[in-house]
């Protein structure tokens, strides 16, 4: 079983994915962290890496290939990333949403080392909106996919007023239902053959 977690910045994707992985005993991968390491290894910020990505596809392709291979080779893991649902289509796909104000406060409180430091939640919100719009445009250009299209996911949760534990519990409950439905579909396909 593979679970992919996407969604809006500040929705708690990494925290939820990490907690869920611990609860299920699964491995955890973060594509945001991987891109952040790529940027830091080159002595630049994630936003500078994204700026390069507007003209050079290698900034995305390396991470994207990693996800594709992972989805083919491994099982029992949770992967957090904006395009993970796309590169691992047989996964249980979760989208985490959040309102802008809550997202800005969360991100401001937990600023990342691969990002330019921000002085206020308002600055964070401006930076996040810009990054999300640029990433969305880049992914449409390279793959023709909208990473924020909720219809692409099996489960959508608004995390604005929920704790990490509440979100994880909802995912586990819905995962059981999804697995049951998929098992029934697979059995029907086998009978038709």
Question: Which residues fall in each region the model found?
Answer:
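Hydrophobic anchor at the beta1->P-loop junction of P-loop NTPases
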Residues: 5
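P-loop (Walker A) phosphate-binding loop of NTP-binding proteins
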Residues: 8
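Conserved lysine of the Walker
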Residues: 13
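Hydrophobic positions on the alpha1 helix immediately C-terminal to the Walker A/P-loop
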Residues: 16
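Post-Walker A helix-loop "phosphate-sensing" segment adjacent to the P-loop in P-loop NTPases
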Residues: 22-29
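ATP-dependent small-molecule kinase phosphotransfer cores
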Residues: 31-88, 101-104, 109-116, 126, ...
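Small-molecule kinase domains that catalyze NTP-dependent phosphoryl transfer to phosphate-bearing small molecules
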Residues: 116-170
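C-terminal accessory "lid"/substrate-recognition subdomains
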Residues: 137-138, 154-156, 166-193
